[in-house]
Amino acid sequence: MIIRSPEPEVKILVDRDPVKTSFEEWAKPGHFSRTIAKGPETTTWIWNLHADAHDFDSHTSDLEEISRKVFSAHFGQLSIIFLWLSGMYFHGARFSNYEAWLSDPTHIGPSAQVVWPIVGQEILNGDVGGGFRGIQITSGFFQLWRASGITSELQLYCTAIGALIFAALMLFAGWFHYHKAAPKLAWFQDVESMLNHHLAGLLGLGSLSWAGHQVHVSLPINQFLNAGVDPKEIPLPHEFILNRDLLAQLYPSFSEGATPFFTLNWSKYAEFLTFRGGLDPVTGGLWLTDIAHHHLAIAILFLIAGHMYRTNWGIGHGLKDILEAHKGPFTGQGHKGLYEILTTSWHAQLSLNLAMLGSLTIIVAHHMYSMPPYPYLATDYGTQLSLFTHHMWIGGFLIVGAAAHAAIFMVRDYDPTTRYNDLLDRVLRHRDAIISHLNWVCIFLGFHSFGLYIHNDTMSALGRPQDMFSDTAIQLQPVFAQWIQNTHALAPGGTAPGATASTSLTWGGVDLVAVGGKVALLPIPLGTADFLVHHIHAFTIHVTVLILLKGVLFARSSRLIPDKANLGFRFPCDGPGRGGTCQVSAWDHVFLGLFWMYNAISVVIFHFSWKMQSDVWGSISDQGVVTHITGGNFAQSSITINGWLRDFLWAQASQVIQSYGSSLSAYGLFFLGAHFVWAFSLMFLFSGRGYWQELIESIVWAHNKLKVAPATQPRALSIVQGRAVGVTHYLLGGIATTWAFFLARIIAVG
């Protein structure tokens, strides 16, 4: 750490009134581009309008102006998020059975949407229990609200109104910080101050205030709810905050106030800041006292982290110094120059953030079921399945986005003249070795993982079960995974003597938590079937990475097209007269990567859905006998491709296929419609541009004949536009089909 003289006083870092507010200008389509603003000559214009509206790089090359537009757009995004949240809370207040659910969460399903009786649609209002008819929701909001300490629909109303006010505030902020007081470029590039505010402010104080809310509001209210007190009898949140005696009745140490904190007698607080591990047997969720403790600890960590960097005082780390000191024996100049890249290329910065956030989202998916954080979440199987699936898809998209913006950085922002022998340059210089090795790994994984299944299908078809890879014949036990499970199951005794259970029941042991006769969670056994499908996961992930990484590393040049950087991020081919150079742009790699991301995530959510129904979810009798939804058939059925088709896809599709005439029939219609959307995509993906141009010209001829031809000349989609429309419908259709299949199934049987 270097101690320097204090920086001069804070500089004025905003420009006043830089851009005038003009509705006339905004009303003109394409005002951001000289070409598009001229108006349409052909139908390609509308596509270009959509493609470039948010591509701020194409509007101007001034980094300050681009930064301001992005900053302003972020406020717009936040405004939409607040609006959406407000809508969720409003539905909870106006159209839901939240108060009824709160009184009996094990027998009443959550619903916050009641369909109006138009053309018989009221059939969709199923009986969710407690005399309420509506659509069962699987978003997890009810469980979240209970954990927050919300006990009435009035409180939801107030929160909804609050969110609306914040939405308006964000909208105003977006306008204000672009048109009235726009930050200068230096402000966007002051990374130490940004770290200070984001770490200590957002994450540190954010976690601290949430921990405070949990201790003072959520914990006492949930304690009353768990004891069966009528929500209307429970004191209101502000009463707990203002009246310490109320809390002291539940947690005696509250009467001592902050004295134990300042006298370092912290164990006094162990009543409400616990370290138990495992799940609360009443609700099937993590102990809320553990969660409060966790947020307090996280707050302390981030408050410290936010004060490690040098801002206006001459003390602390400088990020540039840290990066430039980061050299290894084989990495040349190391991270020299990375600071400049990340403060002048927002694509590079965004790429890193998307990769991190995407990975984190997938980690969230895996923790939501293995450590269910909210009360009564674990026994709401529809919500569990939805949360897992949702976070897996989102994570997949974010990671593909990371590759997309890394490639855009390479094409638009990378300057090879100033980058020599740093880490990125060295990676680019041995990119052939990286990609060819990765390709070999993909071929190996593909043939071996798939080969194990094909072997099993063949042996099964020939009636030779004793020669199959299975837990009852040739075993391929996942020994490393089992070792990790076992280590974690035994951990509390050694690493955390105060904890009564391990972090998650899934690790192993004998504990089982059931709530209201339904299994919340139990140890998840791993066997040959998991070993096989795990290698399919490895295969699909590596292929996705191969495609995306090749797109990034060869974004500027390749042996085939040495001057690729001049052609831009997306282009159909390297001009006429150069055959075999189509579909090589960085954009095309993102396009292809999306399909493999879809493959990868599909296998993961199928694995999860079947494994949980087979080995975890189910009912428990008074004698303690567990009956799983599909009776533990995963271990023997999923070891053949035929088993996946017959016992998972076909057997579990019966609910969605037979949903007509029931309250689940909307899922049947979506299942059909989404298949159609998916099939529609193939028309764009399997067809050439010339075919459509010929067809269009015949149609234009007919219009001319009838004198109804439009002034704007119709054009076939370009190759890139066609592929964009194709992949969009492919993913939308595929995801919506899966959604309908999963939900109809799990709402019917769960």
Curated annotation (Swiss-Prot):
Keywords noted in UniProt: 4Fe-4S, Chlorophyll, Chloroplast, Chromophore, Electron transport, Iron, Iron-sulfur, Magnesium, Membrane, Metal-binding, Oxidoreductase, Photosynthesis, Photosystem I, Plastid, Thylakoid, Transmembrane, Transmembrane helix, Transport
Any Pfam family hit: PsaA_PsaB
Enzyme Commission (EC) number: 1.97.1.12
Cellular localization per UniProt: Plastid, Chloroplast thylakoid membrane
Signal sequence bounds: none
InterPro entries xref list: PSI_PsaA, PSI_PsaA/B, PSI_PsaA/B_CS, PSI_PsaA/B_sf
An example Gene Ontology molecular-function term: 4 iron, 4 sulfur cluster binding
A single GO BP: photosynthesis
UniProt-annotated binding residues for phylloquinone: 692
UniProt cross-references to Gene3D superfamilies, sorted A to Z: Photosystem I PsaA/PsaB
Topology in the lipid bilayer: Multi-pass membrane protein
Catalytic activity annotation: reduced [plastocyanin] + hnu + oxidized [2Fe-2S]-[ferredoxin] = oxidized [plastocyanin] + reduced [2Fe-2S]-[ferredoxin]
Cell membrane found in the keyword field: no
GO cellular component, one term: chloroplast thylakoid membrane
Keyword Coiled coil tagged: no
Transmembrane segments annotated in the record for this chain: 70-93, 156-179, 195-219, 291-309, 346-369, 385-411, 433-455, 531-549, 589-610, 664-686, 724-744
Primary localisation category: plastid
Residues that, per the record, bind chlorophyll a: 683, 691
Binding site for chlorophyll a': 675
UniProt remark on cofactor binding: P700 is a chlorophyll a/chlorophyll a' dimer, A0 is one or more chlorophyll a, A1 is one or both phylloquinones and FX is a shared 4Fe-4S iron-sulfur center.
Subunit relationships: The PsaA/B heterodimer binds the P700 chlorophyll special pair and subsequent electron acceptors. PSI consists of a core antenna complex that captures photons, and an electron transfer chain that converts photonic excitation into a charge separation. The eukaryotic PSI reaction center is composed of at least 11 subunits.
Function: PsaA and PsaB bind P700, the primary electron donor of photosystem I (PSI), as well as the electron acceptors A0, A1 and FX. PSI is a plastocyanin-ferredoxin oxidoreductase, converting photonic excitation into a charge separation, which transfers an electron from the donor P700 chlorophyll pair to the spectroscopically characterized acceptors A0, A1, FX, FA and FB in turn. Oxidized P700 is reduced on the lumenal side of the thylakoid membrane by plastocyanin.
Family: Belongs to the PsaA/PsaB family.
The protein's name: Photosystem I P700 chlorophyll a apoprotein A1
